[in-house]
Amino acid sequence: MQPSHFSPTSTDAHRFTQALAVGAAPDGTEDAQATYQFRTLWLSDIHLGTRDCKAEALLDLLRHCHAGTIYLVGDIIDGWQLRKGWYWPQAHNDVAQKMLRKARKGCRVVFIPGNHDEFARDFHGLHFGGIEVLSDAVHVTADGARLWIVHGDWFDGVVMHAKWLAHLGDALYIFTLTLNRWLNQARHRLGFSYWSLSQYLKGKVKNAVSYISSFEQLLAEEAARRQCEGVVCGHIHRAELRKIDGSIYANCGDWVESLTALVELQDGTLQLLMWKPSASAPVVLAELPPGSASTGQAEAPTQPQASHVPCAS
């Protein structure tokens, strides 16, 4: 399956380069040390340019983590919402600056656009401030596993064939997030913890559960067809790391609600992390040890070990 051709408008292209250009200057923070060192870091569905993007939490992760390669797996910039009205607060600016600074300091940063930043797909093969733009990619882990990296919207029939319905669904999702924000403000005042209305609805609606299962199966099958041992994707805002019919299926989650990332340790171990800025360490939600591409299943997660290294962020 190949992406549909998209010709960005001049406004789209201007906003894309403008969003990257705002990070041209240093972000004003100098991190003496990074707490965690990873071989690879995957992030998706950040949705910069929206009010529900948790940019401050992401910035905290970027300050504490160093990786040799960072893959931005789509929907990094929310072009759909920016077309409706420009929203770009300082925290979103800081995230862009941090990414560009990492690229300048030698980190390989690869941007794989999704449907919300599809305007960038015509820039395939180009570099902006050291950030490489690709439609998809193949990553080879330390233990030799080939992972196909793609946002995932190519496998969403609504996005590909009924874009008006996709935009309607996005509007309903934004409305749900707004309700969720108000609800959790009230819960916080009453002393209750965070609760996700959108995740609750996804789990209760039969069609949503069926859609997620089909999406995951299709991605795993396509990765195998491409002679890869697994796939890393985003799009559905559902963090996951497991085996499907022998193939690794990894979904980075999002930075709207779940605050999750996929990482590869130096030995090829894959971990799905949930980042909590106030916590002493990220929560490891799932883990696949080296060699899992051929034999293993997800194991009980272990906490990542803090490794103080010179920060290249």
Residue ranges and their predicted role:
Residues 129-136, 148, 153, 157-167, ...:
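Conserved beta-sheet core of the metallophosphoesterase superfamily
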Residues 2-17, 133, 200-229, 239, ...:
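Non-catalytic terminal accessory segments
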